[in-house]
Amino acid sequence: MDGEVKSYWFKTFSHKSFSVIWDLFYNTSNGVTKKTINSGTILNHLNEVGLAYWVMGDGSLHREGRVLTLHTQGFSHDENKMMSEELNLKFGFKSKVVKHKNKFVVQFTTSDANKLHDLIKPYLIPTMQYKLPRKL
């Protein structure tokens, strides 16, 4: 190469209509903004497509291929517990909160493999199919 550096960039924009989404995941108190999740967010807003996107972004499949973890370490234990409970209530899972490197994550058990597979498979892009739990 001749020392020329190629780069690409893009610009995003902000709009007041995104404030509704911001309010679901951030709380400002005493001038400090913290990531959070409000009760009912999963029950009222998450569907199968959203769950598939969540798995593609933050999911990891264990070696045996039947246990899936959502890496939710950015949330507190109580927030993880609430998310797990709402996922279980909304979709009929048996997920649980487990400790992972001194933080907490939501984990789907092997008993959820078939249901999780069937729910998200239609929405996973081909390069993310490796995150799909194997059916029992």
Swiss-Prot record:
Its main location: mitochondrion. Signal peptide: none annotated. Pfam families: LAGLIDADG_2 (PF03161). GO terms for cellular component: mitochondrion. Encoded within intron 3 (LRI3) of mitochondrial large subunit ribosomal RNA. Belongs to the LAGLIDADG endonuclease family. This is Probable intron-encoded DNA endonuclease 3.
